[in-house]
Amino acid sequence: VRGSGYKMINMGELFSNDRIYNIDMELVPLTDKEKENAKVEKEDLLFARQSLVASGAGKCSIVMETDDMTVFESHLIRVRLDSSIANPMFYYYYFKSPFSPMKAIVQHSVQAGIKASDLEKLIVAVPSIEIQTKVVEVLSLIDNMIEKNIQINKNLLQQLHVLYLR
């Protein structure tokens, strides 16, 4: 019965959150095997298998934190990188960039989509871990400033509503 059990990241969360934190999610019951196979961990990359629009197929998000047992639904592909050679944040940014090779594996039909087997074969740039970390530092600073500006704008709008819509 949905509504009880474990948190599940679905397509809605993926398309609403580039960086997925410990947010409210749908709860689903799971067997032990399902929990083992679908568990997400911090720094897992999640990709959309399909989308109604080609630009959404292969969309990448990253799990930033999970407090509870959290799993992903079958419309997503989870990638867990070896952090000794690959900075997950670097590849999150890489797959969001114009340099992403994702377009090469998107298949077009009624719904655009990607297959896990094609994602496994995708050839990607592999700069040194030091360069990956430097790139992540810069891009994370920019992302954090954008998030702060969005929050400031929301707060300003709330203040306007309080002042002018009494």
Cite the ranges covered by each PLM segment:
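Amphipathic alpha-helical segments with low aromatic content
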Residues: 121-166
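Sequence-specific dsDNA recognition surfaces
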Residues: 1, 7, 12-45
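Basic, amphipathic alpha-helical recognition segments used for DNA target recognition
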Residues: 1, 15-22, 54, 65-133
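Short beta-strand-centered aromatic/proline hotspots
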Residues: 59-63
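Solvent-exposed alpha-helices and their adjacent loops that cap or buttress functional pockets
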Residues: 2, 38, 115-116, 140, ...
